[in-house]
Amino acid sequence: MAPAGHILTLLLWGHLLELWTPGHSANPSYPRLRLSHKELLELNRTSIFQSPLGFLDLHTMLLDEYQERLFVGGRDLVYSLNLERVSDGYREIYWPSTAVKVEECIMKGKDANECANYIRVLHHYNRTHLLTCATGAFDPHCAFIRVGHHSEEPLFHLESHRSERGRGRCPFDPNSSFVSTLVGNELFAGLYSDYWGRDSAIFRSMGKLGHIRTEHDDERLLKEPKFVGSYMIPDNEDRDDNKMYFFFTEKALEAENNAHTIYTRVGRLCVNDMGGQRILVNKWSTFLKARLVCSVPGMNGIDTYFDELEDVFLLPTRDPKNPVIFGLFNTTSNIFRGHAVCVYHMSSIREAFNGPYAHKEGPEYHWSLYEGKVPYPRPGSCASKVNGGKYGTTKDYPDDAIRFARMHPLMYQPIKPVHKKPILVKTDGKYNLRQLAVDRVEAEDGQYDVLFIGTDTGIVLKVITIYNQETEWMEEVILEELQIFKDPAPIISMEISSKRQQLYIGSASAVAQVRFHHCDMYGSACADCCLARDPYCAWDGISCSRYYPTGAHAKRRFRRQDVRHGNAAQQCFGQQFVGDALDRTEERLAYGIESNSTLLECTPRSLQAKVIWFVQKGRDVRKEEVKTDDRVVKMDLGLLFLRVRKSDAGTYFCQTVEHNFVHTVRKITLEVVEEHKVEGMFHKDHEEERHHKMPCPPLSGMSQGTKPWYKEFLQLIGYSNFQRVEEYCEKVWCTDKKRKKLKMSPSKWKYANPQEKRLRSKAEHFRLPRHTLLS
């Protein structure tokens, strides 16, 4: 891109950020809660399956609610996992490539790892069998797996005697882009169907309708596509009018100024397409495609586009003809990386395919709207009763209709999202968004779509979006950030079970399940529950628990929930806080050494809460807000005094503000010790310490060689007298009073106060104990 182009991109991107910011809360990029892998395990909210062989190389997953199993395809293996707990009771099928095939594959120049048998296809074939296809050392083949009826003895057996060639059903390359859908006994697949990965095509095979595909080497149909998803969606009650939709990205022919421009497409064809009689024989005669747009409106009509589709999710509704389509997109710019989620209604998609065709007279002409006569039956329509019933199959269509469809596969009108803009935009660059799953939830104040977004670091974001019709702004609320795997790993597959309230997540090396919610984690007070804004959770008068819109579990008198506004003050007015949990303010005593640094720690549970510090210098003195400067700094961890003064002594109040709800989280009394008194301590007779009956014990839970947290912090902020301060702290901790406390049993000493135990167990961050406070 030329320098001028770089400047334009920078300006557009800056405007995008400016445009998007007003619709968000104070910290839109922060999740409200951040849970580590360790915390998820301790909450019993997750379960992890890892192959006993040490590798998995997951490529596909299939959720089977009927069999209550999750089927996983990897390298040389197919696994059957328990939906209740994926780490328990797994079964496996070992299905490697033959030694002869592997040797041939390597001799042709492929890497030995690529010459394994990677399972790429898993579909329900009927109630007792699965269809599976695998790469077979660059010689794809398919077979059936017998799983039996749900009521029978569990079965999991590969019927290898029914193996068939898999060309056109499964790619040769294990890493090639690929999608497939089984409709009846017909397998529809979008793939690269040759050994060298050059022949991109959409196939139908296996069933009674016969083998059919897109034309070879016709860039008007497919130009270097990356297949993302495929679904069968009916248009009406006539099954002969059913259509297959393929979602993919490709190089756009109509972007004449840049041959490398990527667009996202929706391709459509009739399930019962038989091809033409004289033209397009055994080729799709109803294939059409339209551009799928996801963009943010910009200055002077110049939009910022997210052109590359990463994932697509179809959310079923009560009407099977009108599911909601969610697309996860990213930018194709080499300068900036951004991601967006757009939502599409089927009415917009059908409108584009029923609209005008795109047309180009010749190489010297531009693409334009076709204004000539359109033949009958309309190109792209199915042979059905809805279409007049005049034609039994597409083979009966007139040649001019087939010829027109062949020359005009592209629709002129693009498909635009709901509200004509994304529901979610992420431009912080923290991680790349890769996978998307959606659950629709009924809450007290309406219906919400909860987005679960998988990233390239093993993080899953749980997000809701709220559209304000008056201002036309979209508020995104990141409810949780979940670290699914212990070690960062890209999420490559996600399956969702609304019935079980579980999300199943696959990486290359492991499969995890995680519950949608854990309501009592939010806190034991009404305000805690309402501030969470989680549509799965509500205050029932006793605790924060699962919200049930109707039925026996509903407690209409006591439910308190406000997802749209999070107005805890209004919702919880008159509610008694259990154990006065919210009224109770944690009190601490802290010491600071004059002219050195001190941190008053306060980390609210919610990362979206604003923290305000107040100080009171005497009992009868009014509280004042702490003024920060180059000496007193407000940090995420608390209030940092770079150089403590005697005048800083007082009582400090850490208050959080979230949706206008104010809560005092912590009260810290700071006592400042004069530096010369600390110096005097080191001139005392050291013999006194040698006569102590009990030596100063090491910090609980700290292994030998582990550096206490405060040492790292003191070195980080640059204490001028680090060694003396360290010695002073050890002397303070080793007083006779402290030794008496340490004589208690370890379990009693660690959590002498039940309230402290509860607070510690629900703490957001795990770290070494800080036995620094004397009361």
UniProtKB/Swiss-Prot annotation:
GO terms for biological process: branching involved in blood vessel morphogenesis; gonadotrophin-releasing hormone neuronal migration to the hypothalamus; negative regulation of angiogenesis; negative regulation of cell-matrix adhesion; negative regulation of neuron apoptotic process; positive regulation of phosphatidylinositol 3-kinase/protein kinase B signal transduction; regulation of cell shape; semaphorin-plexin signaling pathway. Pfam families: ig, Sema. Disruption phenotype: Embryos present defects in the patterning of intersomitic vasculature. The keyword Transferase does not apply. Residues 32-516 form the Sema domain. Keywords: Angiogenesis, Developmental protein, Differentiation, Disulfide bond, Glycoprotein, Immunoglobulin domain, Neurogenesis, Secreted, Signal. Its main location: secreted. Glycans are attached at residues 44, 126, 175, 330, 596. One of its GO terms (molecular function) is semaphorin receptor binding. Residues 1-25 form the signal peptide. Residues 581-669 form the Ig-like C2-type domain. Belongs to the semaphorin family. Plays an important role in signaling via the cell surface receptor PLXND1. Mediates reorganization of the actin cytoskeleton, leading to the retraction of cell projections. Promotes focal adhesion disassembly and inhibits adhesion of endothelial cells to the extracellular matrix. Regulates angiogenesis, both during embryogenesis and after birth. Can down-regulate sprouting angiogenesis. Required for normal vascular patterning during embryogenesis. Plays an important role in ensuring the specificity of synapse formation. This is Semaphorin-3E. It comes from Mus musculus (Mouse).
